[in-house]
């Protein structure tokens, strides 16, 4: 491509002559915020819905406001189009068998634009879009895909990202250009790629792909870790079983498992063969566009692809990508010179390698890896400086700045809803506040590929007043699991149930750190209840309750359930070790057998013991009655003491222990009844919350928060009134000069002229003094820096590394101060005449110095 290089050199000479015109043009294209908003509003009124699937070019009416960059090309752009046209002709001449390049499509106004100038690097003010994965997810959700038509040809047009965002739809090229612009603005080394891909990727067909949300490993909760076996653990008794019989049974079992495994593998293979897509007659010919991210910037470890249609990332050797024709960014354009028979597996993405990639401009960010010939080495070395001065630079983007309003960013999906179909799964998304119950996502899993039989439904919620975050429904087992974020009054964290009716099987988990009783989990069955605690002062961590059948009583219709409570048969409580008590007196487990009037105690085991102390009490019938003698028999207290003590055998100790245990039993019964009441209240509250779901609105959401909006308007009115009041009470600038004359009610013509001259003279003097002060500080800083530099040159050879670093830090700070002073001085010189003229104008308009208020 030698002719292309000659053509570049000819254009370099014309570039110097046009540089001044380009600077004027660039300065004219700088828009302030009001003009930008007007342009965006006019562009949003452009009717883009009439463009058919073939994306036929139409001369669109952009309203009364003209967009020079959209409707015309600058001289620099025309020069670039000439270079691209020359490059394209040479390429088609040298490689007639290759497909044409995607270089100069038409925009929405029917004007040819080079693809590099369509990219507009933009960093939006949203932290979510600073990372590539969130940016790709946003683009894939915000836009609706339009397939290329025909799928074998490059599109004849490429719209600006502002038009694509307004229309909220586009083809793969529109998706990739928008995503690449966002990634470039976020600091990634990103490129658009024009090439070929599989049918499923080009058509965004994910019906044979597993949903990425289903690939996440579900965290197993509440699994009791198995304790490791200790060295002196008692071994189980030896089983007198024939080893030969065991071996034969193991072989038989292995054969059965192998046969079953082979059968399952064959069944899986048949299913996969049935689910495989049919042959594609256009395989390898379907045009596609995606994004390439090279390693280096933003700590990217290796190169990877991003499919902008789905937002997924792939390795550069992935099979869905079948070939690459060209890549480009906002600085240059590269054509692939490598063989793509094996797809992208063997490709190298070193864009500075001229053997693998042919560039359009040499001014790109990628250094050129060339080995000059020996005979041309001296000539090249002599011309390096001249060539660097004449490299053609890519003109600025013709696209308006990409703007996404907060409401649009929050809505994401077109019309606030989007449906994605996967293999045996369907994913539905909604914008926040679109649905009355705060529903934002639903993932439905199916048993068959036709998606007719539901297996599992996962619903996500946002902004719920009841703090509901996620609901999972298992359709096979008929189990519903709800997850809540912190903030509920009952501190509910997880609720797993089959029915919302009380006294049925359910499991509740709580935020224990937010509860006074430290309740962490409550499992309930029709006749049982188990509670797990954490961090209690009484060391209780486990309570198990067994209920009996409710006695048949005549109940009032609609009356409360607690009028006929379930009888409590047994309460078992377990406690952690209390180091302040001896192990022989520290209760580990306490069991109340209410129907038998028996209480069982088991103490903790000491570290050097293998048994524990055990107590069993039989409550006397008249225990707790006053003025009634209590008879303690040997059956009243049965115990086994690891370390016997005399006090344990005294009847007074037994009596006091019985009284204490009776009170503890009553407290446990009261706590059980409170737990039953709390469960009923939680179920009633949940039923009411589901019947009438309420949403919360953040105080920072100015669009939806009416109270915040009214308060903000009131504050603005108060600020405006305060400004007006201060303006009225502003100090009089003539007061010092009128005081010198005795503050007369009226001035003579001579006095008025003198006051005016004195005021202007004082203003002039203060402006001069301020300029002299800034100038003196500027000269002082400059002299000190010069002295420091002279000192450095004199002592440079004997200075340590720390002294050099300190000197460099001082120079940096000094240069910063000098720059600030110079800027302030220049600004003062520019503003001083304006301030003087403004004061003179105010004096001329002051009624106290004008004719009606003057005396003769």
UniProtKB/Swiss-Prot annotation:
Residue ranges the record marks as coiled coil: 245-276, 661-733, 764-790
Localization per record: Cell projection, Cilium, Flagellum; Cytoplasm, Cytoskeleton, Cilium axoneme; Cytoplasm, Cytoskeleton, Flagellum axoneme
Taxonomy, superkingdom: Eukaryota
GO terms (BP aspect): flagellated sperm motility; sperm axoneme assembly; spermatogenesis
InterPro entries noted in UniProt: CEPT76/DRC7_peptidase-like_dom, DRC7/lobo, DRC7_C, MORN_DRC7, Papain-like_cys_pep_sf
Start and end residues of each stretch annotated as Disordered: 1-30, 255-277
Pfam families reported for this sequence: CEPT76_peptidase, DRC7_C, MORN_DRC7
Biased composition (Acidic residues): 12-30
GO cellular component: cytoplasm; cytoskeleton; motile cilium
Record keywords: Cell projection, Cilium, Coiled coil, Cytoplasm, Cytoskeleton, Differentiation, Flagellum, Spermatogenesis
Broad class of the protein's primary localization: other
UniProt KW DNA damage keyword: no
UniProt key word Coiled coil: yes
Compositionally biased region (Basic and acidic residues): 1-11
Similarity remark: Belongs to the DRC7 family.
Record note on quaternary structure: Component of the nexin-dynein regulatory complex (N-DRC).
Function noted in UniProt: Component of the nexin-dynein regulatory complex (N-DRC) a key regulator of ciliary/flagellar motility which maintains the alignment and integrity of the distal axoneme and regulates microtubule sliding in motile axonemes. Involved in the regulation of flagellar motility. Essential for male fertility, sperm head morphogenesis and sperm flagellum formation.
PANTHER family: DYNEIN REGULATORY COMPLEX SUBUNIT 7
Name of protein: Dynein regulatory complex subunit 7
């Amino acid at each position: 491509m030698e002719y292309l290089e000659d053509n570049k050199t000819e254009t370099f000479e014309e570039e110097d002559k046009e540089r001044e015109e380009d600077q004027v043009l660039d300065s004219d294209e700088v828009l302030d915020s009001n003009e930008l908003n007007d342009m965006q509003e006019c562009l949003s009124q452009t009717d883009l819905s009439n463009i058919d699937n073939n994306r036929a070019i139409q001369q669109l009416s952009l309203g009364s406001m003209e967009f020079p960059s959209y409707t015309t090309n600058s001289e620099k752009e025309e020069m670039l189009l000439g270079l691209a046209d020359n490059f394209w002709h040479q390429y088609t001449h040298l490689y007639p068998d290759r497909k044409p390049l995607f270089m100069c499509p038409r925009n929405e106004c029917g004007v040819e634009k080079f693809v590099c100038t369509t990219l507009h690097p933009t960093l939006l003010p949203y932290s979510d879009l600073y990372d590539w994965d969130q940016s790709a997810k946003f683009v894939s959700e915000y836009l609706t895909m339009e397939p290329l038509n025909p799928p074998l040809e490059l599109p004849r047009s490429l719209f600006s990202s502002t038009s694509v965002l307004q229309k909220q739809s586009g083809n793969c090229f529109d998706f990739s250009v928008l995503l690449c612009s966002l990634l470039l603005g976020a600091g990634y080394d990103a490129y658009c790629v024009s090439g070929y891909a599989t049918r499923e990727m080009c058509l965004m067909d994910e019906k044979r792909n597993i949903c990425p949300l289903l690939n996440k490993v579900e965290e197993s909760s509440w699994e009791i870790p198995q304790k490791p076996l200790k060295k002196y653990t008692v071994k189980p008794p030896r089983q007198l079983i024939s080893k030969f019989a065991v071996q034969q049974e193991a072989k038989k079992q292995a054969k059965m498992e192998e046969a079953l495994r082979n059968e399952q593998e064959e069944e899986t293979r048949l299913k996969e063969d049935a689910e495989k897509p049919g042959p594609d007659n256009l395989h390898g010919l379907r045009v596609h566009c995606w994004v390439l991210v090279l390693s280096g910037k933003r700590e990217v470890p290796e190169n990877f692809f991003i499919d902008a249609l789905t937002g997924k990332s792939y390795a550069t050797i992935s099979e869905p990508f079948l070939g690459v024709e060209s890549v480009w960014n906002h600085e240059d354009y590269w054509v692939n010179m490598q063989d793509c028979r094996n797809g992208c597996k063997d490709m190298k993405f070193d864009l500075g390698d001229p053997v693998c990639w042919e560039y359009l401009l040499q001014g790109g960010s990628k250094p050129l890896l060339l080995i000059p010939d020996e005979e041309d080495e001296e000539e090249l070395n002599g011309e390096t400086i001249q060539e660097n001065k004449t490299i053609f630079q890519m003109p600025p983007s013709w696209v308006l700045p990409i703007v996404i309003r907060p409401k649009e960013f929050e809505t994401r999906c077109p019309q606030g809803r989007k449906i994605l179909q996967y293999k045996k799964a369907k994913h539905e998304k909604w914008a926040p506040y679109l649905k009355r119950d705060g529903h934002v996502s639903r993932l439905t899993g199916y048993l068959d590929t036709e998606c007719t039989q539901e297996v599992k439904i996962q619903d996500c919620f946002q902004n719920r007043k009841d703090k509901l975050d996620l609901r999972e429904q298992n359709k096979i087992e008929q189990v519903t699991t709800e997850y809540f974020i912190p903030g509920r009054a009952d501190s509910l964290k997880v609720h797993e149930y089959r029915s919302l009716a009380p006294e049925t099987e359910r499991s509740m988990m709580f935020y224990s750190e937010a509860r006074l009783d430290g309740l962490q989990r409550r499992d309930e069955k029709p006749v049982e209840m188990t509670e797990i605690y954490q961090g209690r002062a009484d060391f209780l961590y486990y309570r198990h309750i067994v209920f009996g059948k409710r006695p048949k009583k005549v109940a009032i219709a609609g009356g409360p359930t607690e009028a006929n409570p379930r009888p409590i048969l047994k309460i078992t409580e377990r406690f952690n070790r209390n180091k302040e008590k001896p192990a022989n007196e520290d209760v580990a487990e306490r069991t109340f057998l209410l129907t038998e009037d028996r209480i069982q105690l088991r103490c903790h085991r000491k570290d050097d013991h293998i048994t524990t102390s055990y107590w069993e009490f039989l409550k006397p019938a008249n225990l707790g009655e006053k003025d009634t003698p209590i008879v303690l028999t040997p059956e009243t207290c049965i115990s086994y003491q690891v370390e016997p003590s005399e006090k344990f055998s005294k009847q007074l100790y037994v009596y006091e222990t019985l009284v204490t245990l009776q009170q503890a039993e009553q407290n446990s019964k009261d706590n059980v009844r409170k737990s039953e009441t709390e469960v009923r209240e939680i179920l009633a509250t949940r039923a009411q919350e589901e019947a009438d779901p309420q949403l919360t609105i953040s105080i920072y959401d100015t669009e939806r928060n009416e109270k915040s909006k009214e308060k903000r308007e009131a504050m603005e009115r108060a600020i405006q009134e305060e400004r007006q009041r201060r303006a009225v009470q502003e100090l009089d600038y003539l007061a010092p000069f009128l005081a010198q004359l005795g503050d007369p009610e009226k001035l003579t013509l001579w006095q008025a002229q003198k006051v005016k001259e004195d005021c202007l003279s004082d203003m002039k003097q203060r402006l001069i003094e301020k300029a002299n002060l800034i100038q003196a500080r500027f000269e002082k800083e400059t002299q000190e820096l010069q002295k420091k530099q002279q000192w450095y040159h004199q002592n440079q050879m004997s200075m340590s590394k720390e002294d050099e670093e300190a000197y460099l830090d001082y120079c940096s700070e000094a240069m910063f101060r000098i720059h600030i002073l110079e800027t302030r001085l220049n600004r003062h010189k520019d503003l001083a005449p304006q301030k003087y003229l403004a004061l003179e104008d105010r004096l001329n308009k002051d009624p106290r110095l004008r004719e009606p208020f003057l005396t003769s």
